[in-house]
């Protein structure tokens, strides 16, 4: 339960009234167990959706493509995932839009099995990702190109969440993967080799975005606004209360090593914005270059609700 040090405002009082009398059911999802999902989990665990009048059901749907399919089928209202899948869907004409960018840097490290010490040794080897076509494969291609290996020289295989991919490297079933904290730190603590840290390079990329249907934004804008109010509140709780956030990270990742959990929190918290607006340069990094047409980058995201909340001074009330 959220600590009661958040300043009570007229806005939150109204939201609380609505939450107790007319809670709006909303189904939301997240795509994986990496640390960049932590603000989303904190928002849920701190009961902030209820605070803003939403009765949220949160589910894990592994992989960006499957999340997009659920959103387009109207099974999910909002999903928290890497930017590649929604941006790809928008490029193909889908009724999708990015509503917020909660983490705008590439946070992955290239991890190799214990017997591989240089990137050149990865040629001809098996490279596992959680889902083919997802953000980890994108990160892998960036890393391999920067290391001079070339993604065409490895075989990409789908292997599921972090623990399964770490196990694949330890068993010899695969030789490399991409991991974000806490999986990244868990892997290196087990003796697996870090060949490249994309996070240290500060590469702009929409690693964690909120996406939904553009038509939903038009038809149920009030619900979308309350959802984003809850997320902004969650970002403030996440940044201001490390001990609570670390407990949430432990719950979702099932990791118990206090050093890894703390290190993972610190890795992300320093770069998480309190107002998760999207910017064109970050979004552009995930726009496919092989799609015809003259679509402008601004067509991929909509900051209008966040800008409205900024004009209203919403985030400032949470920082007091």
Regions found by a protein language model. Name each.
Residues 17-23:
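Sec/Tat signal peptide C-region and signal peptidase I cleavage site
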Residues 84-85, 156-157, 163-252:
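Pocket-lining segment of extracytoplasmic ligand-binding domains
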Residues 1-3:
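N-terminal secretory signal peptides that target proteins for export/translocation
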Residues 5-16:
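Bacterial N-terminal signal peptides
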Residues 218-294:
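Secondary-structure end/capping motifs
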Residues 288-320:
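Conserved C-terminal helix/tail region of periplasmic/extracytoplasmic solute-binding proteins
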Residues 134-154, 229-260, 299-304, 308:
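Ligand-binding clefts/hinges and TM-proximal coupling segments of bilobed small-molecule sensing domains
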Residues 24-161, 165-171, 175-181, 194-198, ...:
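Short, glycine-/small- and polar/acidic-enriched structural segments
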């Amino acid at each position: 339960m959220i600590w009661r040090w958040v300043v009570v405002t007229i806005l939150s009082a109204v939201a609380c009234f609505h939450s107790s009398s007319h809670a709006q059911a909303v189904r939301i999802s997240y795509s994986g167990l990496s640390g960049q999902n932590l603000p989303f989990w904190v928002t849920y665990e701190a009961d902030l959706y209820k605070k803003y009048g939403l009765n949220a059901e949160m589910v894990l749907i592994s992989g960006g493509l499957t999340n997009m399919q659920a959103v387009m089928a109207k099974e999910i209202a909002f999903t928290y995932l890497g930017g590649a899948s929604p941006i790809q869907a928008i490029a193909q004409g889908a009724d999708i839009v990015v509503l917020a960018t909660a983490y705008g840097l590439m946070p992955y490290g290239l991890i190799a099995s214990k017997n591989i010490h240089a990137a050149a040794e990865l040629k001809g080897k098996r490279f596992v990702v959680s889902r083919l076509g997802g953000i980890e494969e994108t990160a892998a291609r960036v890393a391999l190109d920067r290391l001079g290996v070339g993604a065409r020289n490895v075989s990409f295989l789908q292997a599921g969440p972090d623990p399964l991919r770490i196990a694949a490297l330890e068993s010899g079933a695969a030789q490399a993967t991409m991991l974000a904290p806490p999986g990244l730190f868990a892997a290196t603590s087990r003796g697996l080799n870090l060949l490249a840290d994309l996070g240290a390079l500060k590469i702009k990329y929409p690693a964690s975005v909120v996406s939904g249907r553009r038509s939903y934004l038009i038809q149920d804008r009030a619900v979308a606004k309350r959802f984003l109010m809850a997320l902004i509140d969650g970002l403030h709780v996440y940044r201001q209360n490390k001990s609570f956030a670390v407990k949430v990270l432990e719950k979702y990742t099932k990791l118990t090593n206090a050093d890894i959990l703390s290190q993972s929190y610190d890795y992300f918290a320093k770069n998480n914005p309190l107002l998760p607006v999207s910017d064109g340069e970050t979004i552009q990094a995930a726009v496919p270059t092989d799609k015809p047409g003259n679509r402008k980058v601004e067509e991929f995201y909509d900051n209008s609700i966040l800008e409205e909340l900024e004009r209203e001074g919403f985030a400032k009330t949470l920082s007091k």
